[in-house]
Amino acid sequence: MKLSEYNEQISKALDYFEKANIVLTDEEKQNVEVADFGKGMVNDIGLQLVVYVNTERVCAKEMVLLPYQTCPEHKHIPSNNASGKEETFRCRYGEVYLYVEGEKNVAEIKAKIPASDITVFHEVVLKPGE
């Protein structure tokens, strides 16, 4: 990803943190990350995040999914004597569309998922507070 695109994603994420009334320190604003999960399609598959804590057992993050971005289902499996991690999502602003294993449960999914190796289409919709 080009540096200009990376910086644009960060700028958009900071706008959404502000809209959602999530207060970040100056240091946290400087440390916003952009993840494209190795797909190179950050506008479709990716997210922006601030990491508060990241240890072998615990991770605390605030994430922004921009309109039409989706976070692919993934796992943090045990490795190198680490027991792995579980993740959970809580929507603070807007709507979040997650796609997980299971029977396809809607006629047409809400996300714009590009042709890729994504194989799960069971849609979970999160609204603020969920």
Regions found by a protein language model. Give the residues of each.
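A short, N-terminal "cap"/entry segment at the start of jelly-roll beta-barrel domains
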Residues: 1-59, 109, 113-114
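Sequence-level detector for tyrosine residue identity
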Residues: 6, 16, 52, 68, ...
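Generic detector of intrinsically disordered, low-complexity, polar/charged segments
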Residues: 35-37, 43, 65, 91, ...
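A short beta-loop-beta micro-motif enriched in histidine and acidic residues
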Residues: 48-60, 74-91, 119-120
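Residue-level recognition of conserved beta-strand positions in structured domain cores
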Residues: 62, 75, 100-102
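Glycine- and acidic-residue-biased ligand/ion/polar-headgroup-sensing regions
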Residues: 66-67, 84-104
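Tight coil/turn sites that cap or link beta-strands
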Residues: 66-70, 128-130
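Short acidic-glycine-tyrosine-enriched beta hairpin
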Residues: 88-90, 102-130
